[in-house]
């Protein structure tokens, strides 16, 4: 899973920002007012995993990319068994340092950003056997090249390049950083990331041939077809077709239907599978049963479409448990367009998804989940001018943690969320009951 992410000059984030996400649980929320940068975090991870176009902070236009050096740094807590080969060797070296790195090892300018991560590391150490896990900041910069962000220090250099000749240098050179490419590639290859933005087209997203749906199913349509239409069956089809052509040639005597090459081409497995996908799967659209009728998803309301996406993800993961083992799902505003009465059920479904996947991330304006979700973490994001503040709370004891942070900050934190969370939850439950009464009565 990703316990946090460093962002540098990405969208609303100027300079270096560290956003904590979790101390170990897979249910992770981001809440805060409009414009504070919740969606930017989910989008940046989509850039990291799926090579989407980067959206830079406006400062980069004035100062240039070389000067600002934008980057995205997810900090991964992953089982050692996930990696192998050379990537695992690199991970061993890097993780052994990161598990034990201290504030004194970090450059002075970066120490304030590092403290939140250090607090997380200390908390995580109390809950897991760290010998079973790698802790890895995996960095790509705006050029798509490996980097180490604030971790490019002497301690890390000595671990990764123990026999370096330039003893007086305190960081890895760009050439030395290239050695981490194998680790970056392996992590991105081993973990799948599905991002569901607020403005997603549900009709396209839910088609069977999309990559996202196939990831949720745990296998591709081609893999499914290989089981349903075997090589033996394809061989038999080719034999029958060739027999037909041979018989036709005998009837035509000096004429024959042939391919341009001397070797006559048969129907390939990929040809047949592509035809089946095009003629069978692509024409099928998601429908929802309402009464005795089936309604195509495009005929549903905006709220029903949003609910359908979460329902599909939940049910596919529920019945294909292996598909979620290395899957991170990120949802932007899952409550978008939903009636208040449906919010509670939507977030309950999100929680269940988090139990069957590597991690569930979401950005939301709805606080009603805080009092009722059993386990998980929420990051409250606030902003003053260009400065962001990130406060991570354990949902098992969020009331106590909020109270303590308010005391420690001398009342400077915007923690009216205790009232807002209860208010949102009560509204959702009451309205849901009213809807049931109206339907029954």
Model-identified regions with their sequence ranges:
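Pre-Walker A-like glycine/lysine-rich segment at the N-terminus of P-loop NTPase domains
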Residues: 1-50, 60-67
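Flexible phosphate/Mg2+-sensing switch loops adjacent to catalytic phosphate-binding sites
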Residues: 50-76, 84-87, 168-180, 319-324, ...
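Walker B catalytic acidic pair
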Residues: 332-334
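H-loop/switch region of ABC-family ATPase nucleotide-binding domains
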Residues: 363-365
